[in-house]
Amino acid sequence: MSNEAKVEMVPMLQDMRTYITNHYWSEILCEVEEQLPGFKAQMPSCTQGTRLFLHHEESKIVKADFWRRSRTKMSADLYVRLKIGASKNGELPRYFVENMYLSTDFVLDGTIQWLPESTVLLDECPEREDWTKLSKYLVPIFSYDDMELQVQNMLKTYLGETAVTAYQPRAAWKLTKAMELQISSAPLFKNRRTEAILFFQEGIARAERQVGDETVMEEMVIPAKTILLNSNAKSFQRADGDGREIFHECIHYEWHTMFFTLQALHSADLRLLEYGEADRASRPAAKDVRWVERQASYGSTAAALPRPVLMPMVHQYWAEVVNQSINPGDKIAHVIYQIAQEKQVSKGLIRTRLIWLGSPAAKGAFNYVNGRYIANFAFDRESVSSGDTFVISRTQFLDLYEQKEDFRELIDKKLYVYADGHVCLNT
């Protein structure tokens, strides 16, 4: 076995500040030069009666903040160091440095377009209190509460107010149509994990085709603005499909079009990113890529069952069992089962939504382990963190037993036993 340390590989992303510097900085400075005379009053007295101009090579961006204006439009607030020249009557120019702010807008929708007329030179940082901030890679910075509200706003914008006040069957398909996206399907070649891919622009998908007894790969041209469903994925076969894989791609379209455009990707397929060896500078890129998928996963689940639709039903069915002498796991299971029956949605979707909305007791209900649902159970909320579980499959138990010596010692001493999806204290 090799003793060489594993090399960590991370995505190599292009950031917006670097893109502006490399592609638009000189043009932006030309716009700024035209606005300099309006700031003479706050500049050195030697500038009076002179012509002002910028030394482009020695003017630079010190700090950049990016703000989301819409699905495809953003504002860049740049704190800049400007080397300004002042010349008069053909004399040699005198140079001085001013630190100032400027704001300018871009549209990113397959291509990147700068809007020169939006450029404004400022003497102080503009207020952006109610705007959504973007990371340097143009990923929206949302808290989980923000995502809940953003999902509701998206549904209301495209489908109307009723989309967040009453359950909408096939809402994912309706949203796709309202966004002017189309849906297609194909069996992706040797790929059972990817559920769907959004193509922002025309692209190529590698699909399977049967030739006699052999499965071969063929390339398919996928039109722009198409969600391609993978017919090899398990979600494609589910009878109780809630459209989460479609919502997932709609979230990418609504929240991440600018991110994917900046990375010059024609589809929302993060596997197409280039990777390199990790270093300190590349860590934020890896974090942002994780957030792109986390936002789409959270948003798709929230869209499938919006909070204003779910919570009244939860309160209704909880009231039926709140005073019964059964464990909280059984009470939550009753709520989940009744909503699933009423709206014909999966119990897993409801369970996940309850956990994410602050009801960790739902972890004790409808756990599918070893090919069946195990008994509902209750637990001390303080004894498990948000990312942990009390449930383990037989295969996972055996893997731990083989790989973890301290765990193996506890089991061999018969202090704990495996029973019904749990590792239990042997009483």
Give residue spans per PLM region:
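Active-site hotspot residues in diverse enzymes, especially metal/ion-binding acidic/histidine motifs
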Residues: 1-427
